[in-house]
Curated annotation (Swiss-Prot):
This is Inactive ribonuclease-like protein 9. It is found in: Secreted. InterPro entries: RNaseA (IPR001427), RNaseA-like_dom_sf (IPR036816), RNaseA_domain (IPR023412). Glycans are attached at N130, N142. Keywords: Disulfide bond, Glycoprotein, Secreted, Signal.
């Protein structure tokens, strides 16, 4: 049969062999993608912090804004608030879940001014904290399950109270800046609680 093909259709066979012997050509795939500079810088910073083995980097305005401060949107009393926001904002410490965290509904300038308020005892009673003069809305997140990402599970608590923070001096700008959120202390008349159905009840 092969001999018949060669003798009767030599041109067809030649074209077929030419196609088979042609080097395989791979189409170049452009793997580059457009990403805003801010998002890429944030992602690189997250990777650096994620794999860091030394001391935690000192706080910056951008880091506090990204991890602590929130904008109006998702209801603060949503019971899944912490699980969603902690994942979205990449709030972790060296590949492990943070045991607690605070989200505050306020602007950075307002938070920074608290650094110049009077001292009060921190909730652990060891250090001194600065306390806000007015009440601030926020969410307290308490770790309930797992210790390593991405299996962190949190219980969410809406709070409206006085913010306790620690501050640190930043030489570059010659100012005190927020370092950690120590607590969000509710006055007794403003404390939120769960009713019998497990729904958060927020007093006016």
């Amino acid at each position: 049969m092969m001999r018949t093909l060669i003798t009767t259709h030599p041109l067809l066979l030649l074209l077929l062999l030419q196609q088979l012997l042609q080097p395989v050509q791979f189409q170049e795939v452009d793997t580059d993608f457009d990403s805003p500079d801010d998002d890429m810088e944030e992602f690189e910073e997250y990777l650096e912090e994620f794999h860091r083995t030394g001391p935690t980097r000192p706080p910056t305005k951008e880091k506090v804004e990204r991890r602590v401060l929130i904008e109006p949107g998702m209801p603060l009393y949503d019971r899944n608030y912490c699980n969603e926001e902690i994942m979205r904002k990449n709030v972790y410490h060296k590949q492990r879940c943070v045991t607690e965290h605070y989200f505050l509904l306020m602007q950075y300038d307002e938070l920074q001014k608290i650094c110049y308020n009077r001292f009060v005892p921190c909730k652990n009673g060891v250090r001194k904290c600065n306390r806000s003069k007015g009440l601030v809305e926020g969410v307290y997140c308490n770790l309930t399950e797992a210790f390593e990402i991405p299996w962190c599970k949190y219980e969410s608590f809406y709070r409206r109270g006085y913010v306790l923070i620690t501050c640190t001096w930043q030489n570059e700008i010659q100012k005190l800046i927020p370092h950690t959120i120590n607590d969000l202390v509710e006055p007794p008349e403003h404390r939120s609680f769960l009713n019998e159905d497990g729904v958060f009840v927020i007093p006016p």
